[in-house]
Amino acid sequence: MLYKGDTLYLDWLEDGIAELVFDAPGSVNKLDTATVASLGQALEVLEKQHDLKGLLLRSNKAAFIVGADITEFLSLFLVPEEQLSQWLHFANSVFNRLEDLPVPTLAAVNGYALGGGCECVLATDYRLATPDLRIGLPETKLGIMPGFGGSVRLPRMLGADSALEIIAAGKDVGAEHALKIGLVDGVVKQEKLIEGAIAVLRQAITGDLDWRAKRQPKLEPLKLSKIEAAMSFTIAKGMVAQTAGKHYPAPMTAVKTIEAAARFGREEALNLENKSFVPLAHTNEARALVGIFLNDQYVKGKAKKLTKDIETPKQAAVLGAGIMGGGIAYQSAWKGVPVIMKDINDKSLNLGMTEAAKLLNKQLERGKIGGLKLAGVISTIHPTLDYAGFDRVDVVVEAVVENPKVKKAVLAETEQKVRPETVLASNTSTIPIGELASALERPENFCGMHFFNPVHRMPLVEIIRGEKSSDETIAKVVAWASKMGKTPIVVNDCPGFFVNRVLFPYFAGFSQLLRDGADFRKVDKVMEKQFGWPMGPAYLLDVVGIDTAHHAQAVMAAGFPQRMQKEYRDAIDALFDASRFGQKNGLGFWRYKEDSKGKPKKEEDAAVDDLLASVSQPKRDFSDDEIIARMMIPMINEVVRCLEEGIIASPAEADMALVYGLGFPPFHGGAFRWLDTQGSAKYLDMAQQYQHLGPLYEVPEGLRDKARHNEPYYPPVEPARPVGSLKTA
C-alpha cells in the first residue's frame, strides 16, 4: 500500500501501473474537502515513484463519485470570499497535479460521475465507462458553476457547443451520448472495466496511443475562430436568457466565464473560473437552491425511514376515472404497480383510459419506451364498472367529485368490498379527513392522499394523517407514493391540509388587491416577473378552475372563519356567477383558444374588466413592492401557523411542499428560507404596514417571537474552517 486515507487509497496494480481507488465509508463516494486534501497527499506520494508508468483511477462503490458533499456547501459559502478563493486555488492545484503527472492516466468510471466527480475524471487523459454511466456538471442547478476546472476542461475536450449545453443546463448524460460527444473514450461491461482500462494504459505506455497529444488541448486556449466563438456564445447566451432568466444568475455567469476564458491557457482560465465561482457562492440564490437540494434529501430520507419495514403495494385501485383518475392509474402502472380503475359509467372510464394511453403515447413519441412496453403498461390498468378484483387490492385511492356526501358513500361502499387490511385513501383537496373517516368502520385504515394536477408532472403527494389513521396506514400510502416516483410529505388533518390551506390566503390577498383597484394583469406580471412564480394568481385561478376555487374558498372560509370568511363579493364570485370557469370552458380572467398544438392560449378579453368593475374600486396603480407584500404576507403567515399548529412537521417539509406542490420559486428556497434570508424582523416591519387589511395580515405570535430574538427557522450554519485546515483535512 503506497497511501491510505479515510476515503481513498493508492497501491501498485501491476508492472509500473498504480491504482488510486475511491472507497469512502458508507454507500457512496463524495468529493468532500477531506477527500480533496487526501487526493493531494496521495499524489504527493505518487510523484516520488520513479518506477511509475501509468495511473488508473477507479471506485470501489456502485458509483464512481456522486459529486461534492452538498452538506458542506452552506458552511463553505459563508467563508469570506478571499478564503474561499484560496481554497479553490488549492483544490485546483490538486487536479492540475493529477493532470500533469508524467505518465498516462485513465479513469475507469462506473455509475455516477457528477459535479466534482466529473471534474476529477476530466483531469485524466482517458476515460472508460460502464453502460450505466451518468456523467455531467449539475452545479448551475445549485446556483453555482463548476469550480474544479469543469468550465475550463470540458469545452477544450468537447468543443464549446456540447460543453455549454451540459454546463449551462446543469445536465448529465448517459454512456452512449458521452461516447458520441467525446466525453468518454469507450464503454465496456462492468466485469471487463479494469481489464479494458489496463489494456488502454498499456497502449499509452508503449506509445501506441499518444497520451501527450490527448492531454495537450486541455492546457491550451479553446480552438475557436472569432466567428465560431461569436456564434456559439451568442446562441448560448440567448438560450440561457430565455430559459434561466434574471432570477438564476449561475447559467449566464458560466457561459460568460467560458467565453472570457476561451482565449487563455489552463492557468489563466482557471483563475477566471475562480473569480466567477466565488461571488455566485455568496448569492442568496445559491443558498436557496442548495437548501432545496438538502431539504429534498431530508424529505426522501424521512419517507424511506418511515417505510423501511413496509412492503410496497402490489395491487392498487382508483375510484373515479376521468382526467385525475386516469393520471393516477397511469402513474401507478408506469412505475410497476398494477391498478384497477373503477367508475360508474363507461364515458368516464373511457376518459380515464384515454388519458393513460395519451401519456404513454407521449413516452413512445419521445423514444422513452417501445410498443411492447406501452402495451405491457396499459395492460396493467384494468377499467371496470364493478368491484371485481377488489378483494386482492392492497391500497385504494378515491378520486370522485369533491363532495363530502358522495365521497363518504363511495368510501363506505368500497370498505365492504376489500380485505380488512386494505388501506383506503381519499384524493380530496380540501375536505377534512376526519369528516370522511366518520363514514367508515375502520378509520384507522384510512388517510388522505392528495395528488396535484397534472399527476404525471407534479412531484408532490400530500399524505394526510387523520386523527385515527394508523402509522401502518400512513407508511403503506407513503410507500405507494414513493414507488410512483413522487415525493410524499405527511401532514396532519385540517381544512385544506397544508398546500391549499396556505394557497387560499394568497388568493384572498389577490382578491383584496382587485377590490382596492389593482389591475389583475399587472398583479400577474409582478408575481411572475419580479417574485418569480411560474404563473400569476389570475392565470393560476384560470388553470385551477374558477368553479373549483369558488368551492374550495367556501370550504376554507367554513374551516377558518376568523381569517378566511369574506365580508364582500370578490372577483372569484363575479367570474363564477358569470360562468367564467377558466381554461376548462375557455373564459376566465382571460379568454382561451387552442394553439396549433392543442394547448390553451390566453388572450385579452375586455368583457372581464366590466365584470370586475362591479366588485372593485376605481383602478389605481400599486408599486411592485406593495403588490408582492400584499400577495405574500397572507401566505407566509399561514405557513407559519401551520408549523406552529403541527400541521406540517418542519420548515424543510413546508418549503418542499410549497416548491413541489405550488411552484414556489426555487431561487427563494421556500417560505421559511425566504423568511430567513430577509430576516424575521424585516418581515415583521413590512407586515405591520398592512395589518389594517384584516386578520390574514396579522403576524403569528411565534414569528413575532423569532423577530424579537433575531432567530432563524433553519438551524444556523457555521462558516467552514479556515483554508489551512481545509487543506489538511
Curated annotation (Swiss-Prot):
Q: Locate the active site.
A: H450 (for 3-hydroxyacyl-coa dehydrogenase activity)
| Record CDD domains | crotonase-like
Gene3D superfamilies, from UniProt? 1.10.1040.50, 2-enoyl-CoA Hydratase, Chain A, domain 1, NAD(P)-binding Rossmann-like Domain
Q: What are the TM regions of this chain, as residue ranges?
A: none
User: What Pfam family is a match for this entry?
Assistant: ECH_1
Chain residues that bind NAD(+): M324, D343, V400, V401, E402, K407, S429, N453
The EC number(s) attached to this protein equal: 4.2.1.17, 5.1.2.3, 5.3.3.8, 1.1.1.35
Query: Single GO cellular component annotation?
Result: fatty acid beta-oxidation multienzyme complex
Where does the record place the region 3-hydroxyacyl-CoA dehydrogenase?
311-729
- Binding, substrate: D296, N500, Y660
Q: Which domain of life is it from?
A: Bacteria
Q: Which reaction does it catalyse?
A: a (3S)-3-hydroxyacyl-CoA + NAD(+) = a 3-oxoacyl-CoA + NADH + H(+); a (3S)-3-hydroxyacyl-CoA = a (2E)-enoyl-CoA + H2O; a 4-saturated-(3S)-3-hydroxyacyl-CoA = a (3E)-enoyl-CoA + H2O; (3S)-3-hydroxybutanoyl-CoA = (3R)-3-hydroxybutanoyl-CoA
The record's subunit annotation is: Heterotetramer of two alpha chains (FadB) and two beta chains (FadA).
The similarity annotation says:
In the N-terminal section; belongs to the enoyl-CoA hydratase/isomerase family.
UniProt xrefs under NCBIfam families: FadB, PRK11730.1
- Function statement: Involved in the aerobic and anaerobic degradation of long-chain fatty acids via beta-oxidation cycle. Catalyzes the formation of 3-oxoacyl-CoA from enoyl-CoA via L-3-hydroxyacyl-CoA. It can also use D-3-hydroxyacyl-CoA and cis-3-enoyl-CoA as substrate.
PANTHER family attached to this UniProt entry:
TRIFUNCTIONAL ENZYME SUBUNIT ALPHA, TRIFUNCTIONAL ENZYME SUBUNIT ALPHA, MITOCHONDRIAL
Q: What is this protein called?
A: Fatty acid oxidation complex subunit alpha
Q: From which source organism is this entry?
A: Salmonella agona (strain SL483)
